[in-house]
Amino acid sequence: MKINFLTLFPNYFSPFTEESIIAKAIENKLIDINIVDFRLFSLDKHHKVDDETYGGGQGMLLQIEPIDRALDSLESRGGYKILVSPQGKVFNQQKARELSKFDQITFISGRYEGFDERVTELVDEELSIGDYVLTGGELPSMVMADSIIRLIDNVIRKESHEYESFEGDGLLDYPQYTRPREYKGMSVPDVLLNGNHAEIEKWRKEAKYKKTLKNRPDIIERINHEK
């Protein structure tokens, strides 16, 4: 898979591409990361990429032309194009699975007050990582890309994400423990130590449901609604 990041701050992506699993995936040629500074595609002599809002308003808007020209520089205009925006649909695990099937994805990260609305006509969809506002779209782009990349074959072992939160039944993951068995009065549940796999599996299923009900009751409500 090829992933393009259109941004005004290309250095933001250095730690993301140079460390851990993402770096290994790049090294093993499982993914190709391309960072594009769309400021370089401005026709303004000062490389200006923003301007005042028609009709008045706070802040400056990113112009459509530099972004459109940057997309023109990419193979197939960047494949499946995503505008990172707090106004977009909220990204989730199901969307990550869908996007992991594409050969090429492009994330467009904004700054300032946002984009000229016509930029939305250049992309396939707008995505958000939640109902809050950040200083720019770079962090959400990396969050979504990380979630997508780990689902690509051979990036991590299939077993590592097969039973994670939001997979399978859609519930959160069950609680897990390691040594020591007891710490400051906090003990590992006895059922996990008795070696009875049927009882352990039963406990895990019940614990998943309880944890999801406590932390994400909206998931339980959605599952019940879909039945």
UniProtKB/Swiss-Prot annotation:
Which amino acids does the record list as binding S-adenosyl-L-methionine? G110, I129, G130, D131, Y132, V133, L134
Xref: CDD domains: TrmD-like
Q: Where does the protein end up?
A: Cytoplasm
Which catalysed reactions does the entry list for this protein? guanosine(37) in tRNA + S-adenosyl-L-methionine = N(1)-methylguanosine(37) in tRNA + S-adenosyl-L-homocysteine + H(+)
List UniProt keywords, sorted A-Z: Cytoplasm, Methyltransferase, S-adenosyl-L-methionine, Transferase, tRNA processing
What biological-process GO terms show up in the record? tRNA N1-guanine methylation
Q: Please give the positions of the paired cysteines in each disulfide bond.
A: none
The UniProt entry's GO CC annotations, sorted and at most eight, read:
cytosol
Q: Which GO terms describe its molecular function?
A: tRNA (guanine(37)-N1)-methyltransferase activity
Q: What class of enzyme is it?
A: transferase
EC number(s) per entry: 2.1.1.228
Q: Which domain of life is it from?
A: Bacteria
Q: Which family does it belong to?
A: Belongs to the RNA methyltransferase TrmD family.
Subunit and partners: Homodimer.
Record's HAMAP family? TrmD
Stated role: Specifically methylates guanosine-37 in various tRNAs.
Q: What is this protein called?
A: tRNA (guanine-N(1)-)-methyltransferase
